[in-house]
UniProtKB/Swiss-Prot annotation:
Compositional bias annotation for Basic residues: 1-13
Biological processes per GO annotation: translation
Gene Ontology molecular function: any one: tRNA binding
Protein family (similarity comment): Belongs to the universal ribosomal protein uL16 family.
Source taxon at top rank: Bacteria
Residue segments, region Disordered: 1-22
NCBIfam families: rplP_bact
Keyword Ribosomal protein included in the entry's annotation: yes
Function: Binds 23S rRNA and is also seen to make contacts with the A and possibly P site tRNAs.
GO cellular component, one term: cytosolic large ribosomal subunit
Organism this protein belongs to: Variovorax paradoxus (strain S110)
Protein's UniProt name: Large ribosomal subunit protein uL16
Length: 138
């Protein structure tokens, strides 16, 4: 699963996920992409599950790019522990997603196969997504 090799600080503040994606909002590497239209978080497990769904559907064909990386640690406290006594330990990593962000790209497969692969992947993700194709001249 994806996670940073090392971080300067183990824990991070919650922050706010605002605005729309100004970077990573167009198909750059492949011919087709899966674009998020919702705001939210994708965990490393969700990204990996979606990647497996795409890989299994296209079999050996095509090349897949993951355009997001889960670099934000989310900490939780154990069950039935009283409040206070500091912040909990990092449990998993998430990628913050703004509307318009391309999550996956694929090349080397027909459009119908790519569309079906992304439909299967979208079922693994908690956000609404749409299928996009590379714009000519872009």
């Amino acid at each position: 699963m994806l996670q940073p090799a090392r971080r300067k600080f183990r824990k991070e503040q919650k922050g706010r996920n605002t605005g729309v994606a100004t970077r990573g909002n167009s198909v750059a590497f492949g011919d087709f992409g899966l674009k998020c239209t919702d705001r939210g978080r994708l965990t490393a497990r969700q990204i990996e599950a979606a990647r497996r769904a795409i890989s299994r559907h296209v079999k050996r064909g095509g090349r897949i790019w993951i355009r997001v990386f889960p670099d934000k640690p989310i900490s939780t406290k154990p069950a039935e522990v009283r409040m206070g006594n500091g912040k909990g330990n990092p449990e998993y990593y998430v990628a913050e997603i703004q509307p318009g962000k391309i999550v996956f790209e694929i090349v080397g497969v027909p459009e119908e196969l790519a569309r079906e692969a992304f439909r299967l992947a979208a079922a693994k993700l908690p956000l609404r997504t749409t299928f996009v194709a590379r714009q000519l001249g872009a």
